[in-house]
Amino acid sequence: MKGNLDWQPTLINIEPEFANFVPTFRNGQIVRDLMPDQPAMTLNADFYFPEDRVVVELKCMETDSRDAYPERVARAFAHFGHTGSELMGFLFRGEPMPERVAGRIRQQIANPLRQALRKANRQIAATKHHLNIPDAFGLAVFANDNNFGLTPANALSILGNAALGLSNCHVDGFVYMTPNVYHHTGDDIARSVWVPLYSEGKESLADFVNSFGNAWIDYAEQFGEPYLERWKGDEYDVGLLTGKPIERFSRSRK
């Protein structure tokens, strides 16, 4: 959680910095370093924490779900046989979007996250097999790097529903974090999030994840000004989960 309206965010190069951070926390290891003889294209997760027996896969969300939105809407209207006049009615006359069209667009927005979670599940499973750690926890971390079309609640809903649909699930929990996307919640503070969810019966992973998140936030603080405040708790803040991403920060005139 960061500063006021005069503050400007410092963006983090997430993938390399997360890889730099991991060895500083509980002897975290880069999985590729543990498998030097495996072919370069071998499917594997990113990190392993042997002291906690946790395999972690990091996924960066670099594509904005709003990209090509008008074209997506037009195609969805046409897909269900709606006329050009009906499309114009939605775009320019304030007429409601047909539910079938809205459902198709929601599905298209959700698909990249669903696919990323399914791949993370395969990568975690492969890593547990390669390292012979069948009982290790699996954690998928989703870092929003450039997607200003999703609130935290949107992302958590998509990921939660996708996790329920995994077959042979190896993802015991996931984290949604927004190191490069900040949210407006009605005050003058731009806020980022680290929000975990766990599979039923895997809540014991929480101690690791909470410490992991605190350590990452400490590490990330070096890239900008100190955080004004931190909030943590067992209950999710509705205002934060529904906070709209801030695409542009204004600069004060002096």
Language model feature labels by segment:
Residues N27, D52, H170-D172:
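A generic structural signal for alpha->beta connector loops
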Residues Y48-V56:
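Active-site beta-strand-loop-beta-strand hairpin of nuclease catalytic cores
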